[in-house]
Amino acid sequence: MTARAKVTLHHAPNTRSTGALLLLEELGVPYDLKLVNMKANEQRSAKYLAINPMGKVPAVVHNGALVTEQPAIFMYLADLYPEAGLAPAIGDALRGPYLRWMVFYGSCFEPALIDRAQKHAATPQSMSPYGDYDTMLKTLTDHLERGPYLLGSKFTAADVLWGTALTWTTSFKLVPELPVIQGYIARVNERPAMIRGRAKDADLKATLG
Protein backbone atom coordinates (compact mmCIF):
# COMPACT_ATOMS: atom_id res chain seq x y z
CA MET A 1 0.00 0.00 0.00
CA THR A 2 1.19 3.50 -0.72
CA ALA A 3 0.13 6.95 0.43
CA ARG A 4 -1.74 7.28 -2.85
CA ALA A 5 -3.85 4.15 -2.54
CA LYS A 6 -7.44 4.73 -3.61
CA VAL A 7 -9.79 6.25 -1.05
CA THR A 8 -13.04 4.51 -0.11
CA LEU A 9 -15.97 6.77 0.78
CA HIS A 10 -18.89 5.37 2.74
CA HIS A 11 -21.69 7.59 1.55
CA ALA A 12 -25.42 8.15 1.92
CA PRO A 13 -26.81 10.36 -0.86
CA ASN A 14 -28.46 13.65 0.04
CA THR A 15 -26.86 13.80 3.49
CA ARG A 16 -23.84 15.50 5.04
CA SER A 17 -21.63 13.04 3.19
CA THR A 18 -22.61 14.68 -0.09
CA GLY A 19 -19.96 17.27 0.74
CA ALA A 20 -17.24 14.61 0.82
CA LEU A 21 -18.43 13.28 -2.54
CA LEU A 22 -18.30 16.80 -3.99
CA LEU A 23 -14.77 17.28 -2.65
CA LEU A 24 -13.60 14.07 -4.32
CA GLU A 25 -15.09 15.33 -7.58
CA GLU A 26 -13.27 18.65 -7.14
CA LEU A 27 -10.02 16.79 -6.47
CA GLY A 28 -10.55 14.87 -9.70
CA VAL A 29 -9.22 11.59 -8.32
CA PRO A 30 -10.49 8.01 -8.58
CA TYR A 31 -12.24 6.66 -5.50
CA ASP A 32 -14.33 3.71 -4.39
CA LEU A 33 -17.88 4.41 -3.26
CA LYS A 34 -19.77 2.29 -0.73
CA LEU A 35 -23.42 3.29 -0.47
CA VAL A 36 -25.12 3.35 2.92
CA ASN A 37 -28.90 3.12 2.63
CA MET A 38 -30.18 5.20 5.52
CA LYS A 39 -33.80 4.45 4.60
CA ALA A 40 -33.01 0.83 5.41
CA ASN A 41 -31.14 1.96 8.56
CA GLU A 42 -27.90 0.44 7.25
CA GLN A 43 -25.90 3.01 9.21
CA ARG A 44 -26.97 1.16 12.37
CA SER A 45 -26.15 -2.31 11.03
CA ALA A 46 -23.42 -4.36 12.69
CA LYS A 47 -21.50 -4.32 9.41
CA TYR A 48 -21.39 -0.54 9.22
CA LEU A 49 -20.88 -0.01 12.95
CA ALA A 50 -17.75 -2.13 12.62
CA ILE A 51 -16.49 0.57 10.23
CA ASN A 52 -17.77 3.62 12.10
CA PRO A 53 -19.07 2.94 15.62
CA MET A 54 -20.83 6.33 15.58
CA GLY A 55 -23.15 5.09 12.84
CA LYS A 56 -22.62 8.28 10.86
CA VAL A 57 -21.65 9.23 7.33
CA PRO A 58 -19.37 10.20 5.75
CA ALA A 59 -16.60 7.82 6.63
CA VAL A 60 -13.39 7.47 4.64
CA VAL A 61 -11.06 4.49 4.70
CA HIS A 62 -7.58 4.91 3.25
CA ASN A 63 -4.57 2.65 3.69
CA GLY A 64 -6.53 0.76 6.33
CA ALA A 65 -7.14 3.86 8.44
CA LEU A 66 -10.56 5.29 9.24
CA VAL A 67 -11.20 9.02 8.93
CA THR A 68 -14.50 10.43 10.17
CA GLU A 69 -15.87 13.90 11.00
CA GLN A 70 -16.51 16.17 8.07
CA PRO A 71 -13.71 18.75 8.60
CA ALA A 72 -11.16 16.01 9.30
CA ILE A 73 -12.13 14.21 6.09
CA PHE A 74 -11.86 17.42 4.09
CA MET A 75 -8.44 18.32 5.48
CA TYR A 76 -7.17 14.76 5.02
CA LEU A 77 -8.28 14.47 1.41
CA ALA A 78 -7.13 17.93 0.36
CA ASP A 79 -3.69 17.28 1.85
CA LEU A 80 -3.55 13.80 0.31
CA TYR A 81 -3.84 15.29 -3.18
CA PRO A 82 -1.80 18.53 -3.04
CA GLU A 83 -1.58 18.73 -6.83
CA ALA A 84 -5.27 19.69 -6.87
CA GLY A 85 -4.38 22.93 -5.08
CA LEU A 86 -7.32 22.80 -2.67
CA ALA A 87 -5.29 23.18 0.53
CA PRO A 88 -2.57 25.74 1.30
CA ALA A 89 0.64 23.97 2.24
CA ILE A 90 2.17 24.13 5.71
CA GLY A 91 4.20 27.34 5.75
CA ASP A 92 1.85 29.11 3.35
CA ALA A 93 0.42 32.31 4.87
CA LEU A 94 -3.07 31.05 4.02
CA ARG A 95 -2.68 27.77 5.92
CA GLY A 96 -3.75 29.26 9.25
CA PRO A 97 -6.91 30.95 7.90
CA TYR A 98 -7.73 27.76 6.00
CA LEU A 99 -7.55 25.65 9.17
CA ARG A 100 -9.51 28.29 11.07
CA TRP A 101 -12.50 28.05 8.76
CA MET A 102 -12.33 24.28 8.58
CA VAL A 103 -12.52 24.02 12.37
CA PHE A 104 -14.98 26.91 12.81
CA TYR A 105 -17.53 24.84 10.90
CA GLY A 106 -17.62 22.02 13.45
CA SER A 107 -16.79 23.91 16.63
CA CYS A 108 -18.99 26.99 16.14
CA PHE A 109 -21.33 26.87 13.14
CA GLU A 110 -22.99 23.47 13.60
CA PRO A 111 -23.40 23.72 17.40
CA ALA A 112 -24.94 27.17 17.03
CA LEU A 113 -27.39 25.95 14.40
CA ILE A 114 -28.43 22.88 16.39
CA ASP A 115 -29.01 24.91 19.55
CA ARG A 116 -31.08 27.43 17.61
CA ALA A 117 -33.09 24.83 15.69
CA GLN A 118 -33.85 22.85 18.84
CA LYS A 119 -34.60 26.02 20.83
CA HIS A 120 -32.11 25.06 23.51
CA ALA A 121 -31.75 27.45 26.42
CA ALA A 122 -28.89 29.86 25.78
CA THR A 123 -25.61 28.85 27.39
CA PRO A 124 -23.75 31.69 29.10
CA GLN A 125 -21.54 33.25 26.43
CA SER A 126 -18.39 32.62 28.45
CA MET A 127 -19.13 28.88 28.46
CA SER A 128 -20.42 28.45 24.91
CA PRO A 129 -17.98 27.21 22.25
CA TYR A 130 -19.47 29.68 19.77
CA GLY A 131 -20.42 32.59 22.05
CA ASP A 132 -23.87 33.22 20.62
CA TYR A 133 -25.62 32.61 17.30
CA ASP A 134 -25.65 36.23 16.15
CA THR A 135 -21.93 36.68 16.82
CA MET A 136 -21.14 33.42 15.03
CA LEU A 137 -23.18 34.41 11.98
CA LYS A 138 -21.79 37.94 11.82
CA THR A 139 -18.24 36.59 12.03
CA LEU A 140 -19.00 34.41 9.02
CA THR A 141 -20.86 36.98 6.92
CA ASP A 142 -18.34 39.74 7.59
CA HIS A 143 -15.64 37.42 6.30
CA LEU A 144 -17.66 36.36 3.25
CA GLU A 145 -18.07 40.03 2.34
CA ARG A 146 -14.34 40.10 1.54
CA GLY A 147 -14.89 37.30 -1.04
CA PRO A 148 -15.10 35.88 -3.47
CA TYR A 149 -14.06 32.83 -1.41
CA LEU A 150 -13.07 32.21 2.20
CA LEU A 151 -9.40 32.77 1.38
CA GLY A 152 -10.01 35.65 -0.99
CA SER A 153 -9.42 34.76 -4.62
CA LYS A 154 -8.19 31.23 -3.80
CA PHE A 155 -10.81 28.47 -3.91
CA THR A 156 -10.06 25.66 -1.44
CA ALA A 157 -11.61 22.60 0.15
CA ALA A 158 -12.97 24.92 2.83
CA ASP A 159 -15.26 26.42 0.20
CA VAL A 160 -16.59 23.00 -0.74
CA LEU A 161 -17.38 22.41 2.94
CA TRP A 162 -18.99 25.79 3.53
CA GLY A 163 -20.72 26.04 0.16
CA THR A 164 -22.36 22.68 0.76
CA ALA A 165 -23.27 23.49 4.36
CA LEU A 166 -24.77 26.86 3.50
CA THR A 167 -26.73 25.39 0.59
CA TRP A 168 -28.37 22.98 3.04
CA THR A 169 -28.88 25.32 5.94
CA THR A 170 -30.39 28.15 3.92
CA SER A 171 -32.77 25.71 2.22
CA PHE A 172 -34.02 24.65 5.66
CA LYS A 173 -34.18 28.27 6.85
CA LEU A 174 -31.59 27.63 9.56
CA VAL A 175 -29.44 30.41 8.10
CA PRO A 176 -30.93 33.58 6.62
CA GLU A 177 -30.76 33.94 2.84
CA LEU A 178 -28.65 37.09 2.97
CA PRO A 179 -27.27 38.42 -0.33
CA VAL A 180 -23.68 37.78 0.76
CA ILE A 181 -24.50 34.16 1.59
CA GLN A 182 -26.53 33.58 -1.55
CA GLY A 183 -23.79 35.05 -3.71
CA TYR A 184 -21.19 32.82 -2.09
CA ILE A 185 -23.36 29.72 -2.53
CA ALA A 186 -23.87 30.54 -6.20
CA ARG A 187 -20.14 30.96 -6.86
CA VAL A 188 -19.33 27.63 -5.26
CA ASN A 189 -22.18 25.67 -6.81
CA GLU A 190 -21.57 26.91 -10.35
CA ARG A 191 -18.23 25.11 -10.52
CA PRO A 192 -18.25 22.19 -13.00
CA ALA A 193 -17.14 19.62 -10.42
CA MET A 194 -19.87 20.71 -8.03
CA ILE A 195 -22.51 20.43 -10.76
CA ARG A 196 -21.17 17.02 -11.77
CA GLY A 197 -21.04 15.82 -8.18
CA ARG A 198 -24.58 16.91 -7.37
CA ALA A 199 -25.89 15.14 -10.47
CA LYS A 200 -24.03 12.00 -9.42
CA ASP A 201 -25.47 12.26 -5.91
CA ALA A 202 -29.00 12.62 -7.29
CA ASP A 203 -28.49 9.50 -9.42
CA LEU A 204 -27.21 7.59 -6.40
CA LYS A 205 -30.22 8.65 -4.37
CA ALA A 206 -32.51 7.42 -7.14
CA THR A 207 -30.85 3.99 -7.13
CA LEU A 208 -31.74 3.58 -3.45
CA GLY A 209 -35.37 4.51 -4.07
List where the protein language model places each region.
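Phosphate-coordinating loops and pocket residues in cytosolic domains that bind phosphorylated ligands
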Residues: 50, 162, 190, 199-200
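GST-like domain detector, emphasizing the conserved glutathione-binding G-site
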Residues: 1-128, 134, 141
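GST-like fold's C-terminal all-alpha helical module
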Residues: 101-192
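Short Asp/Glu-rich motifs
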Residues: 42-44, 188, 207-208
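Conserved beta-strand edge residues that scaffold enzyme active sites
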Residues: 38-39, 158, 202
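Terminal-tail/helix-coil boundary detector
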Residues: 197-209
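Active-site-flanking alpha-helical
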Residues: 23, 78, 165-166, 198
